[in-house]
């Protein structure tokens, strides 16, 4: 969630999140059209004691990318950060599904619903794909389409409907993949 929030805070209009999950690995890609980073910033963002000046009033460090990078390395996964100043950023990472140090997925439906309702989110599309025993499936959550149906994400009733809808989509994912 923190990495997607970085996209929102970087002024992104379009953010695409893809989660591909199989029996052997989990691959996640976050692409945005935010302000992007130069080469120095790309190296610096993996330092836990670096945070962009003025980005946060009360926080002086940015731990999301450094912690993610550390977790990926510990679990034998991969991490790629691509960015160009003025063009946006792509973060792609993977975890081996069966590695002891791969963190648990947790309540993915709640996490995805929270991202969709984030006050800085504009055009957010989340694609969730899975493969298990030769079968493939998935779903797409498009914030714009969900807003057309629900109207807004401020009221508790609409937030509950959003959460229930995302949970219903996630319930279709086979348990051995989750």
Give names to the regions the model predicted.
Residues 20-28:
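Short beta-strand-loop-beta element adjacent to the nucleotide/active-site pocket used for signaling
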Residues 32:
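Acidic ATP/Mg2+-coordinating residue in the GHKL
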Residues 50-60:
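Glycine-rich ATP-lid/hinge loop adjacent to the conserved G-boxes
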Residues 87-89:
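Glycine-rich GHKL/ HATPase_c ATP-binding element in histidine kinases
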């Amino acid at each position: 969630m923190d990495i997607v929030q970085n996209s929102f805070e970087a002024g992104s209009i379009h953010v695409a999140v893809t989660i591909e999950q199989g029996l052997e690995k989990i691959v996640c890609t976050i692409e945005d059209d935010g302000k992007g980073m130069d080469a120095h910033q790309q190296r610096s963002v993996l330092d836990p004691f670096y945070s962009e000046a003025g980005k946060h009033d009360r926080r002086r460090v940015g731990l999301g990318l450094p912690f993610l990078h550390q977790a990926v390395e510990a679990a034998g996964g991969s991490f790629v950060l691509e960015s160009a100043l003025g063009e946006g950023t792509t973060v792609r990472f993977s975890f081996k599904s069966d590695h002891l140090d791969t963190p648990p997925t947790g309540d993915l439906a709640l996490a995805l619903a929270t991202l969709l309702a984030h006050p800085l989110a504009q055009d957010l599309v989340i694609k969730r794909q899975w493969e298990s025993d030769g079968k493939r499936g998935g779903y797409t959550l498009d914030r714009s389409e969900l807003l057309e149906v629900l109207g807004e994400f401020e009221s508790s009733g609409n937030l509950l409907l959003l959460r229930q809808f995302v949970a219903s989509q996630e319930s279709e994912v086979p348990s051995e993949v989750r």
